[in-house]
From Swiss-Prot:
NCBIfam families: kdpC, PRK00315.1. The keyword Iron-sulfur does not apply. This is Potassium-transporting ATPase KdpC subunit. InterPro entries: KdpC. Pfam families: KdpC. It is found in: Cell inner membrane. The chain crosses the membrane at residues 10-30. Keywords: ATP-binding, Cell inner membrane, Cell membrane, Ion transport, Membrane, Nucleotide-binding, Potassium, Potassium transport, Transmembrane, Transmembrane helix, Transport. GO terms for cellular component: plasma membrane. The system is composed of three essential subunits: KdpA, KdpB and KdpC.
């Protein structure tokens, strides 16, 4: 019985620290130092939230750049069901899935001459990826230009404007945020 009091006081102390002080402190510091990121990196137009800069969206029309396929359950880019397809590289189902995606992309992009970029046919580990390479975006330019009646040069400049360079040049590659790029396309129509 003599060991119960120190054990109980240690438990209550750690409960207070890990269940109260630490979460409140990290929330306060996050809101202070990184308010935009701590609140979900939401992209707003006036009072309307159009999306998050961190989570992809299911853009399907010919007038939009398409991102990586989503492997989330129930609906594409479902943040409550984040996860990959869990299909191994050796799984024949993955081969069938990729072949179907390549065929669909070829049909939707008949003017694209180069091979289909790999990130347009493979889902990311989270199933929520919002970035593709500038090359994958450029591959889709003929389709988007035709659907929106824009020039190739306009779309090339837009991709360059929304391309983000890696923090360190030799680690990573440039990426384009598909959500921001497509929202910029919509603004061109206004």
């Amino acid at each position: 019985m003599s060991g119960l009091r120190p054990a109980l006081s240690t438990f209550l102390f750690l409960l207070l620290i890990t269940g109260g002080v630490y979460p409140l402190l990290t929330t306060a510091l996050g809101q202070w130092w990184f308010p935009w990121q701590a609140n979900g990196s939401l992209i707003r137009e006036g009072d309307t939230v159009r999306g998050s800069a961190l989570i992809g969206q299911n853009f399907t029309g010919n007038g939009y750049f398409h991102g990586r396929p989503s492997a989330t359950a129930e609906m594409p880019y479902n943040p409550q069901a984040s996860g990959g397809s869990n299909l191994a590289v050796s799984n024949p189902e993955l081969d069938k899935l990729i072949a179907a995606r390549v065929a669909a992309l070829r049909a939707a992009n008949p003017d694209a001459s180069a091979s289909v970029p790999v990130e347009l046919v493979t889902a990311s580990a989270s199933g929520l990826d919002n970035n593709i390479t500038p090359q994958a975006a450029a591959w889709q330019i003929p389709r988007v230009a035709k659907a929106r009646n824009l020039s190739v040069e306009q779309l090339t400049q837009l991709i360059a404007k929304y391309s983000q360079q890696p923090l360190v040049n030799y680690i990573g590659q440039p990426v384009v945020n598909i959500v921001e790029l497509n929202l910029a396309l919509d603004k061109l129509d206004e």
